[in-house]
């Protein structure tokens, strides 16, 4: 057993759990699985110094990613740096001013179909302490006043819009000509209506996905104890409680999460952000520890020496995995 054995152990556990109780008793080498799970947990615990992983990855991003940071699309890297108290290169804001000035339309939209472009920038710039109502003379909030526009991107659009609006406790703009004005209540209701029978959320289909479930929880977390959710407060609490149970149940026996059949770091990252938003410690809460391995342990098992994270265990350092992994650890440590 090594730190790279997670996929094999998870597959073996799935095969074992699919058997009837009678058939399980016939598996002569079942103790090998149990011992492998315990050994894996010990290896992960002994090999990982989580705070060091967080610090070294932050150093790596600051030192090596200046070119990546100085462009639209690097918002998750910027968000992690800004929220961790590190410096964001000045070139990033200059690049954003240029991008906004070249792409924004008369309705304040950076993209005709993706409201998340506005939302992501609002999240990043708010974390930097920038004025999102005056980026090269343009107000990024304006587009988020139109519910139809937000809902064009379905679940993702609504999640990001709510996160963006709440990141600075922003008032929602009144958009002239909008058929349906956006409100926080309408965005929350959309998420509640989209919750699946199993208690989670999915980009498509009727089975919960860890990433979308975690992201929906992130968006609803601020309303868990009512806030301005009004009469929806009770419904939000019930929905989030169900989702937390679902996320706990989806965790693999090696502490991680699978998406489309692959054990990966990004799913673990999203779950960590969701749990910290609720005040749940993802490293110590028993619901998110399997065979001694927490979801934070799982994320850190994808760490690449020198800083950064892999997408999958046998992969190379990955930009998206690194951005989300660092952002997740920032949410955990801040």
What are these regions (language model features)?
Residues 1-45:
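Beta-rich interaction/scaffold domains
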Residues 12-18, 191, 247, 299-307, ...:
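A composition-driven surface/loop motif
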Residues 43-47, 84-86, 94-95:
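Ser/Thr/Asn(+Pro)-rich, low-complexity disordered segments
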Residues 45-69:
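N-terminal module-boundary/linker segments of secreted carbohydrate-active enzymes
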Residues 64-88, 110-133, 150-185, 189, ...:
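An alpha-helical repeat/solenoid feature that recognizes helix-turn-helix modules
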Residues 93, 137-141, 184, 188, ...:
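Core helices of alpha-solenoid repeat scaffolds
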Residues 141-153:
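Asp-box/WD-like beta-propeller blade repeats and closely related beta-sheet repeat scaffolds
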């Amino acid at each position: 057993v090594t730190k790279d054995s997670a996929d094999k152990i998870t597959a073996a556990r799935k095969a074992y759990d699919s058997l009837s109780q009678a058939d399980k008793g016939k598996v002569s080498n079942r103790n090998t699985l149990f011992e492998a799970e315990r050994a894996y947990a010990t290896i992960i615990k002994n090999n990982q110094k989580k705070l060091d992983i967080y610090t070294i990855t932050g150093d790596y991003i600051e030192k090596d990613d200046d070119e990546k940071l100085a462009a639209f699309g690097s918002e998750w890297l910027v968000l992690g740096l800004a929220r961790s108290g590190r410096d964001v290169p000045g070139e990033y804001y200059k690049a954003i001013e240029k991008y906004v000035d070249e792409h924004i339309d008369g309705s304040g939209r950076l993209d005709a179909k993706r409201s998340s472009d506005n939302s992501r920038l609002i999240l990043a710039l708010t974390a930097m302490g920038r004025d999102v109502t005056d980026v090269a003379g343009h107000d990024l909030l304006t587009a988020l006043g139109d519910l139809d526009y937000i809902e064009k991107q379905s679940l993702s659009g609504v999640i990001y819009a709510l996160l963006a609006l709440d990141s600075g406790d922003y008032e929602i703009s009144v958009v002239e000509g909008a058929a349906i004005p956006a409100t926080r209540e309408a965005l929350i209701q959309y998420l509640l209506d989209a919750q699946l029978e199993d208690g989670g959320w999915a980009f498509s289909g009727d089975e919960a996905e860890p990433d979308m479930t975690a992201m929906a929880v992130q968006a609803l977390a601020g309303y868990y104890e009512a806030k301005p959710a009004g009469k929806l407060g009770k419904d939000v609490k019930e929905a989030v409680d169900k989702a937390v149970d679902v996320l706990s149940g989806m965790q693999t026996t090696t502490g991680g999460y699978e998406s489309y059949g692959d054990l990966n770091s990004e799913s673990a990252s999203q779950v960590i952000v969701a749990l910290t938003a609720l005040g749940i410690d993802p490293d110590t809460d028993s619901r998110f520890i399997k065979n001694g391995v927490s979801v934070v342990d799982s994320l850190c098992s994808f760490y690449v020496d020198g800083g950064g994270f892999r997408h999958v265990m046998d992969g190379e350092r990955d930009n998206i995995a690194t951005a989300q992994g660092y952002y997740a650890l920032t949410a955990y440590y801040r």
